[in-house]
Amino acid sequence: MDDNVLAGLGSPLVRVSSPPETTVAAKVESRNPGGSAKDRPARWMIEAAEAAGDLEPGDGIVEPTSGNTGIGLAMVGAVKGYDVTLVIPAGKSVERRQLMRAYGATVEVVDGDIAAAKDRADQLEREAGMVQLRQFENPANPRSHYETTGVEVLEQVGDRRVDALVAGVGTGGTITGTGRRLREAFPEVRIVAVEPATNAVLSGGDTTGDEFQGMGPGFVAPNLDESLLGDARTVELPAAEAECRPPAREEGPPVGQSSGASSLA
């Protein structure tokens, strides 16, 4: 018997529709307790802050978020007894706000993009004495994926060779941490970043849009190790949303916009 839901972090690697002579597999991160890959850095960032003495019982946590990191922090905060305040741009989904509140978090909605949410979180950190975990630059974020996601992939592929890793980019944690672990095992692995066509900072394209849920923050996060990347692909939102439907209808796992984008890439 586990002590709490945090012991349930982890996800299966599942074969999906693939071209002939090729195996494509997806990490079904919705199987994490909070429903996404962001449960991993949420736990690691909080526990790193505790270990460093930066977060103590009675402290409040504040973080800007487009959704899933906030849900993960709200869940981990509920387990550990922290008050969590999350600042989210108005354009992000109402359903994510509802989940954050269901875990007991305070949700503050701001006009603008994630940069506006970061400014408000900075203000709350200064004025209310809250602890901000700073997911875009906190090394515990990619470390969580190096120690968990990457390790799981290596165990799950068995004696197969991994030729490529494809992942959406937001904070840079998933692709950096997982990519580093896979590169150690497979030096020739190709690591492909996926970003919105309307927020293509890596590809040098348009940066005017913020419609995607969960990726494309509009800047290159300090946590993103660009030296790992072999390529960056852009995907239009309508195409990503259309790509979400076949996996749920034909293979079972429901996926969101960023997964649809990665599948297209």
Each PLM stretch: what is its role?
Residues M1-A265:
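PLP-dependent amino-acid enzyme catalytic core
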